[in-house]
Every structure is written in structure tokens, then in C-alpha cells.
């Protein structure tokens, strides 16, 4: 059901569009609804013209939204609402302020940052009232023409979470963007005071909602929301075990265009510790070894994922996009960390490793709705000025393209730590991270690019900090020690 709703949001038809080529109901796994039709997908995403648009709006960095939302449908619903009502996209808020970034760094610094802070708190208090996110229930009604969001669900929890989102979008609509606050160094963020970190200091729920209700069915949700929010994001990615024949293709290189947000971010005086390099072409801190790799021909362009046993999946689109975005051969990524190019175990080692884990989970969700990466694909990759776009023909191909494109952009914008290439087996111990648990606890979300102080040891503490926002019951919102990005 999660993926059916995600499909609906991504692929809602435009006027005059052809019927959706949904999977044959007989091919769907047990438990998935066979009542799939056009009207099922009409709703809050009816004004989104394509899969590419919505993921382009998300941007290439994980931010504050990944810390708030635990599933694709609600995340994409919010992104569409924000885009529709405010004309803004999460990509406009990459590393914005102290609260709009993925990890809470300190007190908000402007009105938009306050929006993010209050949206976090609104969801945190909702969890305290046992109101958990249900991807099968999308209650927001978005009117793009009149730029209005309506929350009319009879379920109190649905309406509460919808109202939190409505407040956030309306807050952003009234707040301006201060571009100087993008990629703000965390050292400028002031730690939160005890008053602001206390869950009881000030409730941020919409007016009319009791702070500690004994019965969520009695929650009154009338009244306007006082919350304000600012958005930043990228979405969650994924991987698969299916088998596909290796395909050899050629790709032409183009000259680097140093205009992307990732390159700008790296150019803002950030220093990188030894062994860590950004993979974006055109960034001067790429070492000589990397330049040699970028200058040689690749043996193949498919990204190979080794599954359990002898199974192997050749992901041509992912490999081509990685090559386009970084000018590095896909095989350089295949043995990175605990999850890149393999069925991993333990906590992902860093941002790049988390991109691979997320890609695995994205493909796993596609598999559950009947879209298998191992099938012969008619998808193609367009590469121009180191910008890659995956173009699919059928609905499944478009969704699988979205998984691959998100993964490629996430991996390309992350730092490449040479010490994590082909890591010792002892570093990847324990149980594999469950996609289900990861989505619920936030372990699939990733912070934006690592700072100069980030190393291979930082992943476990990051997971703990993230659980402050997403575990039940959540701990108080606390600022991370200064010095991180």
C-alpha cells in the first residue's frame, strides 16, 4: 500500500494523459490492493507533471524533512504542497540556518528557520500523543489555484499531522529566503536553552489540541495553526537482489560545469581531512589518484550489486549516472562502506554508505509493488554538462529511474573517504539495517555532506542524534555540539 500511494503521488495524470500502466493486479504481491485505477491516484499530486519534476524539487541533499517524515508518501505530499502553495522547493533550503538542515544544530536564526523548528516540534509532540504517520492515509487537500491546504479528515491523528504540515507550508509562504543562510556553518548556531529543549516548555501544536490528551479520539483540531516552517530535503533511495545480465555501453564525457549547488557548497572554504575527497568533477580538492581514475576508460558502466549467494544485479542506469555526475567509473563505488555494491550488515559508515542503503530500500519498495529492477529495461540516461537524467517509458521504469537518479545524486554529492573503500569485514558486523525499521527510526536518512571533522567513526553517534526526533517517545530537541556542519 505504501508504494501504491507513492506511485499515485508521483504519477497522477495530467489532462489528456494516457491511463497509467500500473502492474497487472495478478502480479502484485499478496496484501496489495487490486483495485487500482486512475481515480485512486487523483489527489494532492494531480498537478505534478512528472516523476522528474518532484524529485528535482527535492534536491540532492537530505535535510530537515527526512528527519520529520518516516515514509515516501507523506514526504512527497508535503513537498508537493510546499511547491504548490509557496512556489518554493526543498532544494532552495540546502543546509539552511540551524533548524532547516537534517540535524538540529541550535536555535533558529530567522523566520524560515523558525518554521522548520516548529514543524519538528509539532511532529514530536504528535508522537507523544501516539499519533504516528500512516503512509496509507494522505489527508491533505491541496488547492494549487487558490494556494490553500485543507485538513478535513475525521481521524484526529490524521488531521493533527495534516495541520502540522499546513502550518509549516503557510509559514514558509510568509517567510523570505536569505541566501546567505544556505550552507551556514554550524559554529554560528546557538545551543538551545533548557526552556526550548524541554518538551513541556511551550507546545507548538495547533490551537485547540490538548497538550497531553488521554484519548486521541477526543482531540479538537479546529483553529488555525500557529506553527511556521522552513524546508530542506532530499529523499530516500534504495537497492535490490534481482539478477540482470551485464550490459556494456559507451558514454561520452562532457566538460565540467561548476555551477551546481554541490560545487558551490564545497567551494565555500571547506577544508577536507586527509583521505576524504568530494567526487564532483571540477572541485579542486580531488586528489591526483582520482584525476587518473577520471581520465581512464571504464571497463564497464553498469554498477554491479552482489546479492546473497551468487546472485548479481547490474544496474546500468545507476552506473551511467554516477559516471556522468562524477566522471568516476561505477566500480569505484561498489566496495565502499558496508552497503555499496553488496548486501551489508551493521550501521552504514557515512553519508555515501547511507545513500547505498537507501537505494536498496527504495528498490525493495518498488519490488513490493511489482516493479523489478532485474527485468529488461527500456530506460535511458541523458547526460549533459555533468547533469544526469534517467528517462523511463513505463510507470515501473520511471519509478525505478527515480530510485537510481536519487541514489546517483546522493552518492555524487557525498564525500568519498578512501579509508572506507573495501573496508575490513570486522567493521561491518551485526544485523543488516531493516528498511522497515530504518524508515521508522530515521536510520535511512542522511545528513548533508560531511564537514572536515567527519570521519569513519561518526555514523553511530549520528544515528543516536537522529533518534531524538523520531523514536517513541522522542527525547527533547537538543543541539549537536558545535563544530559539525
Curated annotation (Swiss-Prot):
Main location: secreted
Self-association and partners: Interacts with OTOL1.
Lineage, top ranks: Eukaryota, Metazoa, Chordata, Craniata, Vertebrata
Swiss-Prot/TrEMBL keywords: Calcium, Disulfide bond, Glycoprotein, Metal-binding, Repeat, Secreted, Signal
Region (Phospholipase A2-like 2): 315-371
Glycosylated residues in this chain: 37, 178, 288, 417
Region (Phospholipase A2-like 3): 383-435
Region feature (Phospholipase A2-like 1): 75-189
Segments of this protein annotated with the region Disordered: 444-485
Record remark on domains: Consists of 3 PA2-type domains.
Gene that encodes the chain: Oc90
Protein name in UniProt: Otoconin-90
Intrachain disulfide bonds: 84-144, 98-189, 100-116, 115-171, 122-164, 131-157, 151-162
Source organism of this protein record: Mus musculus (Mouse)
Tissue expression from the record: In the embryo, highly expressed in the developing otocyst with weak expression in the brain. Also expressed in nonsensory epithelia of both the vestibular and cochlear portions of the developing inner ear. Not expressed in adult or embryonic macular sensory epithelia.
Amino acid at each position: 500500500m505504501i508504494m501504491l500511494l507513492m506511485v499515485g503521488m508521483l504519477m497522477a495524470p495530467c489532462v489528456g494523459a494516457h491511463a497509467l500502466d500500473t502492474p497487472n493486479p495478478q502480479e502484485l504481491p499478496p496484501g496489495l490492493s487490486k483495485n487500482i485505477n486512475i481515480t485512486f491516484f487523483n489527489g494532492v499530486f494531480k498537478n505534478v507533471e512528472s516523476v522528474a519534476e518532484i524529485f528535482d524539487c527535492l534536491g540532492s541533499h537530505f535535510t530537515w524533512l527526512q528527519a520529520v517524515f518516516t515514509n515516501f508518501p507523506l514526504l512527497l505530499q508535503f513537498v508537493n504542497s510546499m511547491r504548490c502553495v509557496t512556489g518554493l522547493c526543498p532544494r532552495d533550503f540546502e543546509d539552511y540556518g540551524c533548524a532547516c538542515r537534517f540535524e538540529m544544530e541550535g536555535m533558529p536564526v530567522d523566520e524560515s528557520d523558525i518554521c522548520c523548528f516548529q514543524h519538528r516540534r509539532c511532529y514530536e509532540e504528535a508522537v507523544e500523543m501516539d499519533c504516528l504517520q500512516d503512509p496509507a492515509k494522505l489527508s491533505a487537500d491541496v488547492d494549487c489555484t487558490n494556494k490553500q491546504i485543507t485538513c478535513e479528515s475525521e481521524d484526529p491523528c490524521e488531521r493533527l499531522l495534516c495541520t502540522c504540515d499546513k502550518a509549516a507550508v503557510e509559514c514558509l509562504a510568509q517567510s523570505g529566503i536569505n541566501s546567505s543562510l544556505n550552507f551556514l556553518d554550524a559554529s554560528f548556531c546557538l545551543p538551545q536553552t533548557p526552556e526550548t529543549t524541554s518538551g513541556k516548555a511551550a507546545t507548538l501544536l495547533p490551537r485547540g489540541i490538548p497538550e497531553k490528551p488521554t484519548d486521541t479520539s477526543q482531540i479538537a483540531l479546529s483553529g488555525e495553526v500557529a506553527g511556521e516552517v522552513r524546508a530542506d530535503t532530499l529523499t530516500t533511495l534504495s537497492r535490490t537482489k534481482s539478477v540482470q545480465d551485464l550490459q556494456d555501453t559507451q558514454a561520452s564525457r562532457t566538460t565540467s560545469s561548476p555551477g551546481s549547488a554541490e560545487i558551490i557548497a564545497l567551494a565555500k572554504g571547506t577544508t577536507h581531512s586527509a583521505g576524504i575527497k568530494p567526487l564532483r568533477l571540477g572541485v579542486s580538492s580531488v586528489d591526483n589518484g582520482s584525476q587518473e581514475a577520471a581520465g581512464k576508460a571504464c571497463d564497464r558502466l553498469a554498477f554491479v550489486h552482489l546479492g546473497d549467494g551468487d546472485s548479481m544485479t547490474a544496474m546500468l542506469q545507476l552506473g551511467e549516472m554516477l559516471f556522468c555526475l562524477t566522471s568516476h567509473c561505477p566500480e569505484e563505488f561498489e566496495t565502499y562502506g558496508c552497503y555499496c555494491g553488496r548486501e551489508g550488515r551493521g550501521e552504514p559508515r557515512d553519508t555515501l554508505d547511507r545513500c547505498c542503503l537507501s537505494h536498496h530500500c527504495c528498490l525493495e519498495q518498488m519490488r513490493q509493488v511489482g516493479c523489478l529492477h532485474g527485468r529488461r529495461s527500456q530506460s535511458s540516461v541523458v547526460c549533459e554538462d555533468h547533469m544526469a537524467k534517467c528517462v523511463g517509458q513505463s510507470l515501473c521504469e520511471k519509478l525505478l529511474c527515480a530510485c537510481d537518479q536519487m541514489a546517483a545524486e546522493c552518492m555524487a554529492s557525498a564525500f568519498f573517504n578512501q579509508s572506507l573503500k573495501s573496508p575490513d569485514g570486522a567493521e561491518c558486523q551485526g544485523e543488516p539495517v531493516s528498511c522497515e525499521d530504518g524508515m521508522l527510526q530515521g536510520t535511512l536518512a542522511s545528513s548533508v555532506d560531511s564537514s572536515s571533522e567527519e570521519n569513519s567513526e561518526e555514523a553511530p553517534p549520528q544515528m543516536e542524534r537522529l533518534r531524538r526526533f523520531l523514536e517513541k517517545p522522542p527525547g527533547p530537541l537538543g543541539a549537536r555540539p558545535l563544530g559539525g556542519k
